[in-house]
Each structure stands twice: as C-alpha cells, then as structure tokens.
Amino acid sequence: MAAKTVQLDIVSAENSIFHGQVSFLEVNGAEGELGIMPNHVALLTKIKPGMARFIKQDGSEEVLYLSGGLLEVQPTAISVLADVALRADDIDEKAALEAKERAEQAIANAGTDFNYEAATIELAKSLAQLRVVECIKKNITR
C-alpha cells in the first residue's frame, strides 16, 4: 500500500522552491514546531525562521531554510509562502557565521537605544541557516 501524500508548494518572493507530493512536513510555526501529514486539519499560521523538513513521495527527505512567512494547510494541500527559502547548497555558511557573530556582539554590547528584537531575529536567522548546513553535512535531520 502506497503512503498517503499531500500536495506541497513552497514558494519565496524570488521563485518556486518545491512543488510535489509529500507524506510529512515539519516547520517552525508561531507557537512551536509543527508536523503536518495528509488530511491535517485546516490551519493558517506564521512561520518563524528555521529549518523545514519534508519527506517526498519516494521516501527521500529534503531540508530547507525558511526565514519566515506563512503556512496554509488544507486537507489535500499545503502552501508555504516564505520570505526567503534556501536549500542547504544555496546557504553561504561563512556569511551566516559572520551574521551570527555580529548579532551576538551587538547583543553583548547593547546600548540604551539598542534594537534588541532586530538583533535576536538576526541571530535566530543565522543560527537556523547554520543548523540546515550542519544537518546536510552530517546527513541528519534532527
């Protein structure tokens, strides 16, 4: 018996990242991690910066970095509208490390008119990119 699947579309402002059938999707929603399977209840939520992992119809897994966006789930279709979506191959690891270091330094040296929220968002984005790269390098998904 074939595994049940659902249509997944992941698009960013620049292009379509993925269009196909999946048996599972994992993303970071506004309230925490979400695991979506076929026939999931309808849902609309914000996506936080982080890793998205999905299992394709052939059983292979793919991991992406999402900088944020919206997730719409219907029983037969899932749509991810990402601000930025990158495959691990497209992530500049050196730039992500530099962004992480800049954000950590900015937080450590915060002044009175420091934008803490912007610095923590930048830190979260760089850490999420590095996590995707690390997962691919180690060939793991958690």
UniProtKB/Swiss-Prot annotation:
Keyword Disulfide bond in the entry? The reply is no
Report the leader peptide range: none
Q: What does the UniProt keyword field contain?
A: ATP synthesis, Cell inner membrane, Cell membrane, CF(1), Hydrogen ion transport, Ion transport, Membrane, Transport
Q: Mainly localized where? A: membrane
List the Gene Ontology MF annotations in alphabetical order.
ATP binding; proton-transporting ATP synthase activity, rotational mechanism
Which Pfam families has this protein been placed in?
Answer: ATP-synt_DE, ATP-synt_DE_N
Subcellular localization = Cell inner membrane
Name the membrane topology term. Peripheral membrane protein
A cellular component term (GO) from this record? proton-transporting ATP synthase complex
By its UniProt entry, which InterPro entries does this protein fall under?
ATP_F1_dsu/esu_C_sf, ATP_synth_F1_dsu/esu, ATP_synth_F1_dsu/esu_N, ATP_synth_F1_esu_C, ATPsynth_dsu/esu_N
Q: What does this protein do?
A: Produces ATP from ADP in the presence of a proton gradient across the membrane.
Q: Which HAMAP family match?
A: ATP_synth_epsil_bac
User: What family is this?
Assistant: Belongs to the ATPase epsilon chain family.
Could you give the subunit structure recorded for this chain?
F-type ATPases have 2 components, CF(1) - the catalytic core - and CF(0) - the membrane proton channel. CF(1) has five subunits: alpha(3), beta(3), gamma(1), delta(1), epsilon(1). CF(0) has three main subunits: a, b and c.
NCBIfam families per UniProt? ATP_synt_epsi, PRK00571.1-4
Entries under PANTHER family matching the protein: ATP SYNTHASE DELTA/EPSILON CHAIN, ATP SYNTHASE EPSILON CHAIN, CHLOROPLASTIC
For this entry, the protein name equals ATP synthase epsilon chain
Q: What organism does the UniProt record list as the source?
A: Shewanella frigidimarina (strain NCIMB 400)
What's the encoding gene here? atpC
